[in-house]
Amino acid sequence: MANPIRKGADVNSPWARLEHKRADWEWRILKAYKAGNTSKQDKYARFRCAVMSPYTYGSWEYGDVYVTDIINRPGIDIVHGTPEFYDWLEDYS
């Protein structure tokens, strides 16, 4: 399957929004560099993200995050996802 979230998104309309249950961390997925099935096989697969945490003082920091660091991790929940993101996630599973 082709990568449905390969095109870059804006921080205000990301492909998905994830939050940590107990910490004040939020990840907004702006782009996936690889399709879900390819990302599953690559431990270095990355998302382009905007991240806000207690250490960013209310600002977004932009950068790459390993897929394995935020997908299917205990304590990190998907708060919102677009249909395209859920297609990517189904392909990843």
Describe each PLM feature range.
Residues 2-18, 25-28, 38-93:
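Charged interaction scaffolds used for protein-protein
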Residues 34-35:
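Short, conserved beta-turn/loop elements at beta-strand boundaries and strand-helix junctions
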